[in-house]
């Protein structure tokens, strides 16, 4: 799979999105509540455009198309999250969300890896778990397992029954191994 080069502009947008995520955490926003869904899609807009109004204007049609597709694609993911909240541990929930949003059809038009990483850390942070930050040491494995997930489809029964659970388990194990106390709330 072709990997996008990490530029200063991409890094700035990701930092902007993390700042927004910090605001959401301070307000105790539930991203998977009906009211929180706007904030969830805003995270995607932030990782792609930041909060710069000129850039947002430039990508206005893309933002509108993303919102339209998002509202159709979030339902099964949100249902799964609600059904499993409190039943599964935070790493299982994080991996389950990430797999479901990254497989086909992807939740967003672009920025699924970046937004997914933010949201899985939001889930872990809410439960006071260690966070996962992509580093030079974890990037290759993260992108490899993410690439396998990305090639799976929620709409193909074989993928849904066989591949997706396997990918979720692999990603969950990767998260548990790679999460670091260096990025916790207390560090």
Predicted regions and their residues:
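FIC/Doc superfamily catalytic core
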Residues: 1-187
